[in-house]
Amino acid sequence: MVKEKYTRFERARIVGARALQIAMGAPVLVDDDGRLDPLGVAIAELKAEIIPITVKRKKS
């Protein structure tokens, strides 16, 4: 499996979308370690590379 490198814009969009999902009641995929804010949990999921969001890019 190839580790995908995201641009800063993709990371911002992914974290924002996942934080919204968590705030709306989606299950958390990492140990929260006392984090209560959805943004912190979304960032932890991205760092752990288990965030359930994919990026589709145009082929050039």
From Swiss-Prot:
PROSITE patterns: RNA_POL_K_14KD (PS01111). Keywords: Cytoplasm, DNA-directed RNA polymerase, Nucleotidyltransferase, Transcription, Transferase. Its main location: cytoplasm. One of its GO terms (cellular component) is DNA-directed RNA polymerase complex. GO terms for biological process: DNA-templated transcription. It comes from the Archaea. GO terms for molecular function: DNA binding; DNA-directed RNA polymerase activity. Its EC number is 2.7.7.6. It catalyses: RNA(n) + a ribonucleoside 5'-triphosphate = RNA(n+1) + diphosphate. Gene3D superfamilies: 3.90.940.10. The keyword Nucleotidyltransferase applies. InterPro entries: DNA-dir_RNA_polK_14-18kDa_CS, Pol_omega/Rpo6/RPB6, RPB6/omega-like_sf, Rpo6/Rpb6. It holds the Pfam family RNA_pol_Rpb6. It is found in: Cytoplasm. Belongs to the archaeal Rpo6/eukaryotic RPB6 RNA polymerase subunit family. DNA-dependent RNA polymerase (RNAP) catalyzes the transcription of DNA into RNA using the four ribonucleoside triphosphates as substrates. PANTHER family: DNA-DIRECTED RNA POLYMERASE SUBUNIT K, DNA-DIRECTED RNA POLYMERASES I, II, AND III SUBUNIT RPABC2. Part of the RNA polymerase complex. This is DNA-directed RNA polymerase subunit Rpo6.
